[in-house]
Swiss-Prot record:
The gene is hisF. PANTHER family: IMIDAZOLE GLYCEROL PHOSPHATE SYNTHASE HISHF, IMIDAZOLE GLYCEROL PHOSPHATE SYNTHASE SUBUNIT HISF/H IGP SYNTHASE SUBUNIT HISF/H. GO terms for molecular function: imidazoleglycerol-phosphate synthase activity; lyase activity. It holds the Pfam family His_biosynth. Pathway: Amino-acid biosynthesis; L-histidine biosynthesis; L-histidine from 5-phospho-alpha-D-ribose 1-diphosphate: step 5/9. Belongs to the HisA/HisF family. This is Imidazole glycerol phosphate synthase subunit HisF. Its EC number is 4.3.2.10.
Amino acid sequence: MLAKRIIPCLDVRDGQVVKGVQFRNHEIIGDIVPLAKRYADEGADELVFYDITASSDGRVVDKSWVSRVAEVIDIPFCVAGGIKSLDDAAQILSFGADKISINSPALADPTLITRLADRFGVQCIVVGIDTWFDAASGKYHVNQYTGDESRTRVTQWETLDWVQEVQKRGAGEIVLNMMNQDGVRNGYDLEQLSKVRAVCRVPLIASGGAGTMEHFLEAFRDASVDGALAASVFHKQIINIGELKTYLAAQGVEIRVC
């Protein structure tokens, strides 16, 4: 069995790490490189960086900090933000990233997933899915351009359909960003994760809602996710990564302990 992964998420805007609640009202957390090094030193299995306004601004992720991160950490990291061509991806990978993640650009042009997978291999290609539960309809819908509140829009895709579509096109991993839960720290949406897990044959990463160590355990035990991504509990030092992994191992979760 592959070890489960603990993945701190660093949302980047204007060269700094920020964090919002339900993808809104972002506050500045700190500088990118020192935070990345701290999480690597604490025992994170990998890191994810989202340049949250790149797609809505019509630009690619700022690559200047990617190489600086690569110089100070020795764990895999994934970069996302406005990547919409093979050249964009090649540049980011050449600066030291191990994976690239696409979200809004994949919705705009689903063939991008296949072209990237064919060029760089599926192991490098992550698709991020920003999913919102609409209580009125009882359905999960995919959202686009979520880094900019004024441009966020609901797409035609229901989440389960898009999960299956991106796999057909070559996604090597899926990060499910559950917008309703984002930043509120009351637990991952286990019902949604379980529904996605049932149709997802590639590694699935849960994102949105972690507030306690038990929430991580529930995601691994009850929804069978491969990794758990979190931000605010790490940024605000509510949970220490090393202590979290010790706790999970004691609960029988297969995990790399520092």
